Regions:
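Basic, helix-initiating cap at the start of DNA-binding domains
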Residues: 1-51, 55-60, 64, 81
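An amphipathic alpha-helix adjacent to DNA-recognition modules
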Residues: 34-45, 49, 54-55, 66, ...
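Key DNA-contact positions within bacterial/archaeal DNA-binding proteins
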Residues: 70
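Short helix-capping/turn signature of helix-turn-helix
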Residues: 76, 135-139
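Hydrophobic alpha-helical connector segments
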Residues: 85, 99-128, 151, 177-184
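Helical hydrophobic small-molecule/effector-binding pocket
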Residues: 113-135, 156, 185-192, 196, ...
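Hydrophobic/aromatic-rich alpha-helical bundle segments in the mid-to-C-terminal region
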Residues: 131, 144-148, 152, 166-217, ...
Length: 239
């Protein structure tokens, strides 16, 4: 749990340092603004947990942080902006988790397995945020390029680790293809969605469904065995 628990502090520190690097120093006013923004996002998550992700009420969010709604717009100019900031926060947090898992294991299949396991731990710990990140639960919401960037960086980490697994003959090269990685992510997303739908409120360690991840990854690795012929491919020809 240490990886997940350290994320909030590290994200705040990242924002803090970003302002410092831009302006040369962080003033008390800037620090207060950053803290207030984070408090607003925390309150938004709490409201979404109670009322539904798509039912975010900014009046209620403002009340919980001691602001009037017009004052909240000094920090976020719309409800969409709050969703966008939460989306960016979530994928930044997930990127930190992937980085810790993959670099800590030195890449390769063991690192990918740990990264997928920590991804499910994150989703179980942050079910409301996970809905926003991986489903289209808010009609019309499209994340900004900036908010989506951390998701793409995380995917690049997985691609690199999967390529290393293929180079080390831990998996067949087809596993490191775009289709192979898409299949891996679909497998993990399936376990996550089953847990979310059928075990609301059940933690990572207690979940019967999350426990299916390890055998599912075993089956994936067996399917993409490095013992298969190099030219083997599971994908239907498009010719």
């Amino acid at each position: 749990m240490a990886i997940v628990e350290s994320i909030a502090y590290r994200l705040f520190y990242t924002l803090f340092m970003a302002v410092r690097e831009t302006n040369g120093a962080v003033t008390p006013r800037e620090r207060h603004r950053l803290q207030t923004r984070e408090e607003i996002l925390d309150a938004a998550l709490a409201v979404m947990a109670e009322q539904g992700v798509a039912a975010l009420n900014l009046t209620e969010v403002a009340r919980r942080v001691g602001l009037r709604q017009p004052s909240l717009y000094q920090y976020f100019d719309s409800r969409t902006a709050v969703y966008d900031a939460l989306f960016e926060r979530g994928w930044r947090a997930h990127y930190e988790i992937l980085t810790a898992a993959i670099t800590g294991q030195g890449g390769g299949w063991a690192a990918v397995r740990l990264a997928m396991r920590e991804t499910l731990r994150f989703a179980a710990a942050q079910p409301v945020l996970a809905q926003l990140l991986v489903t289209r639960v808010v009609p019309g919401f499209v994340p900004s390029d900036r908010a989506y960037a951390a998701s793409l960086r995380g995917l690049d980490l997985v691609r690199t680790a999967m390529a290393a697994a293929a180079e080390r003959a831990e998996l067949h090269p087809a596993a490191a293809s775009e289709n192979g990685i898409a299949l891996l992510l679909a497998l993990v997303a399936g376990v996550a969605s089953q847990h979310s739908a059928n075990e609301p409120g059940v933690g990572f360690a207690e979940s019967r469904l999350i426990a299916l991840l390890d055998p599912a990854l075993d089956m994936y690795a067996a399917y993409f065995s490095p013992d298969r012929p190099p030219a083997w491919t599971p994908w239907a020809s498009t010719d």
